[in-house]
Amino acid sequence: MRPDDINPRTGLVVALVSVFLVFGFMFTVSGMKGETLGNIPLLAIGPAICLPGIAAIALARKTEGCTKWPENELLWVRKLPCFRKPKDKEVVELLRTPSDLESGKGSSDELAKKAGLRGKPSLQGQGELPMASSITTPTPMEEGECQSPGQSGRREETSRYLDGYCPSGSSLTYSALDAKCSAWDRSEHPEPEDSIFFVPQDSIIVCSYKQNSPYDRYCCYINQSQGRWDHETIV
């Protein structure tokens, strides 16, 4: 913005319209004296030339050089159907999902529908579907207390397969839908700082923590339904 508070684009509009303003003012003054152009009085021609130029300058001032819509004026134009932008309901729901998860609003079924997990079966013997709003990497003590006995077979097979790639004692595996500890268990063990959001359903999380590693820590997500346990390398 210039020191005189005039947008350069607005100044360009004034320069282009100044010709119409000058001739419109001259015709208006001549028409007030009774002069005519043939049978047409100049008093009718002058305002017809001058008023559009004044309107163009006013519009350029309101829109900051025709770069944006005015804030308070021309509200009726925005309400026209041609100016309305359709909003995708799915995008709106996905945008609202993180705030709902952080604030705790909405039931587990509603959050499952928003995350696209409505058609997948839930675990047996659990009243609610635990969402991955605050799934954290457990310590070895928490892992022993929060294990689900119904998935021992698949877990043991996966653990044996991963033993060849991860040193013993450096990896922790658990399902994303395991039951969490109760309230009195959480008070004894503080929650880790890092949290993982929207973990895929029925997936295995492998986290490695090495003291001398330059990469500090990393986690891998493995889908049990899509994994083949013959000749694969998991990075």
From Swiss-Prot:
It is a multi-pass membrane protein. It is found in: Membrane. This is Transmembrane protein 215. It comes from the Eukaryota. The chain crosses the membrane at residues 12-32, 40-60. Signal peptide: none annotated. GO terms for cellular component: membrane. Disulfide bonds: none annotated. The lineage of its organism: Eukaryota, Metazoa, Chordata, Craniata, Vertebrata. Keywords: Membrane, Transmembrane, Transmembrane helix.
